UniProtKB/Swiss-Prot annotation:
The keyword Signal applies. Residues 1-29 form the signal peptide. This is U17-myrmicitoxin-Tb1a. Keywords: Amidation, Disulfide bond, Glycoprotein, Hemostasis impairing toxin, Secreted, Signal, Toxin. The modification Alanine amide is found at A56. Expressed by the venom gland. Belongs to the secapin family. It is found in: Secreted. Its main location: secreted.
């Protein structure tokens, strides 16, 4: 009986760690997506070409 209780506890522990890691991954990827989608700000007279500021003309 004691071994069965230990196995059930370890299964609950693994599920808990899995859910926590999924939650952390979702939060981190959401933050990275916000950073990636931020618009580039170039000085006046410059345009964005392939993610870099270039002189317009």
């Amino acid at each position: 009986m004691e071994k069965n209780r230990t196995n059930i506890f370890s299964v609950y522990l693994m599920i808990t760690f899995l859910l926590i890691s999924i939650f952390i991954t979702m939060v981190m990827s959401d933050g990275e997506a916000t950073i990636i989608n931020a618009p580039n700000r170039c000085p006046p007279g410059h345009v964005v070409v392939k993610g870099r500021c270039r002189i317009a003309g």
